[in-house]
Structures are given as C-alpha cells and as structure tokens.
Amino acid sequence: MGYRIVDPDDVEVPDGRPCEYRSLTEAGDLDEMAMNLFRAEPGEQVPLAYHYHEQQEEAFFVLSGTLFVETPEQTYEVPEGHLFTVDPESPQRAHNPEDADESVELLAVGAPPAPDDAVAYDPGEDD
C-alpha cells in the first residue's frame, strides 16, 4: 500500500509555459495517470499549443473561474465546479480569454500518462 499528500505549493513551476503549471504526477508518484494544476491569467492559454492526444483521454476540472476550450466545432465555456472531458484524437486549446475578469484554475488529469502523445493541431488545415 502507498499513500502520499502533495502540497502543490511545494511543486516547482517551470519556465517556458504559457501559464502557471505544476506537474503533480511525479510528486504524487503516479504511474497510471498524469495530473497537473494550472492557473491561467486573462489572455493566457493552458497548453503549449492547440493539440490533440493520440491515446490519452483528458479531463479538466475547473477549481475557480471559467475555462474556455476551443475545438474545431465550437468554443466551450466551462464554469467553476464543472468537468470538461476530451477523447483521444480530439483537438482542443484550453485558455482564459483576454477579456476575462479573473484567472482560471484547473486540475487536469490525463490517462494513460503519455508525455510524447501530444500532436500539434493547425485549425487552418481543416479548410
């Protein structure tokens, strides 16, 4: 058996990300899922790029604020306390719009953990 308590404030925020990002996967010693905590100020996007995953399912639980998720068909508005799920091979770009009144904080879970599974998506290529 194994148990851990992780304080996200103890997890280092790496440079080079479009918003505040804390990977909880390693700190929680997780093997079967990836877990990340994000905080995006107005005008910041959550992922490094508009993308999809070939095998990984993703789930975003909004802890505070409102998350906007752009997809090829529409932009979803996900309020605080709600969950947004993404199937494999489904392009998305989670962000906090420039005209937002507040930051958005979310917990992102992906399974299976697949650090090299993300594929950049260009919405202009669908035309």
In which residue ranges do the predicted regions lie?
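Conserved hydrophobic/aromatic beta-strand scaffold that supports enzyme active sites
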Residues: 23, 35-39, 59, 83-85, ...
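A short, N-terminal "cap"/entry segment at the start of jelly-roll beta-barrel domains
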Residues: 1-34, 120-127
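Short beta-strand His + acidic residue motifs that chelate non-heme Fe in jelly-roll/DSBH
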Residues: 69-70, 86, 92-100
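Conserved short histidine dyad/triad with adjacent acidic residue
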Residues: 20-23, 36-53, 88
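Short acidic-glycine-tyrosine-enriched beta hairpin
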Residues: 72-89
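Double-stranded beta-helix
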Residues: 97-127
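Short, charged/polar surface micro-motifs in flexible loops or helix N-caps
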Residues: 30-31, 41-46, 66, 112-114
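Short, conserved beta-strand element in jelly-roll/cupin
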Residues: 38-40, 52-71, 109-111
